[in-house]
A protein has these predicted regions:
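Acidic, Mg2+-coordinating phosphoryl-transfer loop and its flanking beta/alpha structural elements
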Residues: 150-194
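Structural recognition of alpha->loop->beta junctions
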Residues: 96-116, 182-208
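Conserved Lys-Pro-Asp/Glu-containing loop-to-beta segment of HAD-superfamily phosphomonoesterases
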Residues: 126-159
Length: 211
C-alpha cells in the first residue's frame, strides 16, 4: 500500500530509540494542529505547477507563529495528485515546501512537518485525504495524540478525517471554503466543529479552547 511523502527534516529516530533502550521516560503525546496547504495557508491556485504561483496568505505566518508560541505543533498535510496526473514533478512539490518553510521562518513562524500525498484516488493509497495515513504517520514521528487535535481546511472532504481520529475540525472560508459551505453544507452528513473566515480566525478558536 502506498505511503505518504514528507517534506520536513527526518525525525530524530535514533535518539528516540536510544531513550527507549535506556528506559528513559517518554514525553506524553501532545495534540497538534494539522493544516491543509492550498486555500488554507496559501492561495488556492488549482494545480500549483510553478514556484512563482505559490502565494502565502498575508495572515498565515502570524497565525502559525501564535501557535508556535504556545508550544503547539503545526503540521501541513496536503494532497498533491498533480504528481500522479503528470501535471508537475514531485520535485516541484518539495521546492514549494522549502519555499513555504523559508517564508515562514523569515516571519518567525515554523512548521513541525509537512506531509503530502502524491497519488490520485485511483491509486488506492493509504494517505490521500480523507484517509488518515498522513495524520497517523505524523503522530508516530512526532509523538502526537490525534484525539483532541485540530484539523483546519478549506475543503469539507479533508475534514472528514477528524471523526476518524477523534480530532476537531474547522472549515475556513478561504480557497474553496466559502463556496463549499454556501452550496453544499446541507448535504454534509456531519458538520464541522467550527466554520470561520480564515486561518487567523481558526487560530483564535484553537487558542480559546486551551484556556
Amino acid at each position: 500500500m502506498k505511503q505518504p511523502s514528507r517534506s520536513s527534516p527526518p525525525p530524530r529516530i535514533r535518539a528516540k530509540q536510544r531513550r527507549r533502550a535506556a528506559g528513559a521516560p517518554q514525553p506524553a503525546p501532545r495534540t497538534a494542529v494539522f493544516l491543509d496547504r492550498d486555500g488554507t495557508i496559501g492561495e488556492e491556485m488549482g494545480y500549483l505547477n510553478h514556484l512563482r504561483r505559490f502565494h502565502l496568505y498575508p495572515f498565515a505566518a502570524r497565525a502559525i507563529r501564535r501557535l508556535n508560541r504556545r508550544g503547539i505543533p503545526v503540521i501541513v498535510v496536503t494532497n498533491q495528485s498533480g504528481v500522479a496526473r503528470g501535471f508537475f514533478p514531485e520535485a516541484l512539490v518539495r521546492r514549494v515546501h522549502r519555499l513555504l518553510q523559508k517564508r515562514l521562518r523569515a516571519a518567525g513562524a515554523r512548521l513541525a512537518g509537512i506531509y503530502y500525498c502524491p497519488h490520485q484516488k485511483s491509486d488506492h493509497c493509504a494517505c490521500r485525504k480523507p484517509k488518515t495515513g498522513m495524520l497517523r504517520q505524523a503522530a508516530r514521528e512526532h509523538a502526537l495524540r490525534l484525539a483532541g487535535s485540530w484539523i483546519v481546511s478549506d475543503r469539507y472532504s479533508d475534514l472528514r478525517m477528524a471523526p476518524r481520529v477523534r480530532a476537531r475540525s474547522i472549515l475556513v472560508k478561504t480557497g474553496y471554503g466559502r463556496g463549499d459551505y454556501q452550496w453544499h453544507r446541507k448535504t454534509w452528513p456531519r458538520q464541522p466543529d467550527r466554520v470561520v473566515e480564515d486561518l487567523a480566525a481558526a487560530v483564535n478558536v484553537i487558542l480559546r479552547s486551551r484556556r
